[in-house]
Amino acid sequence: MIVSGLALGCDTVGHEGALLAEGKTIAVLPTPIDAPVYPSQNQGLADRIVGGGGALVSEYAPGAMLHDKQLVSNLVARDEWQPGLSDGVIAIETSVAGGTNHAMKHAQGTNTPIAVFDYSSRMGEDFYADERFGGNVKYLKDGAFPIFEASTIEDFKIAMESYRQRNFRGASGGTALGRDSQLNLFG
């Protein structure tokens, strides 16, 4: 399952990839659920997410009136909600100041596993010098799980499962709850 923010770029590609694979995806919105989708270019994608059995979620009550000045802080809040709905966070491409950093920092603060794409084997030293990947480089130095080929994505999935097993136990402290018992959004 893909949880992302419906932003243009990697978020859009992630949601569309999940739908193409007939998987589920959740879009965390920076606006109330009944407001126009932001960004408006992704209204059709939002409709396909819901039509495909996914979900649009928002922390803002339907009908809430939000001002344009609030959008920046809403975008940050949206980014911070995503790790809370996820077993792990993967950064595809982020600069040091990119919005992805809000999600990554929140994940680090809650000990949610993080991974970043490591393009150094393809780009060589250019990877470390390219500002578009400054955040990737930073998180790799901080110990994020490196993803550089398909098998490392599978390894990260194992790390996320281990995290879930350690952190989501029943009230009795017994065996770990299954995914469906933890969060059954899709019935």
Feature-to-residue mapping (PLM):
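Glycine-biased, small-residue-rich flexible motifs in mid-sequence functional cores and linkers
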Residues: 1-187
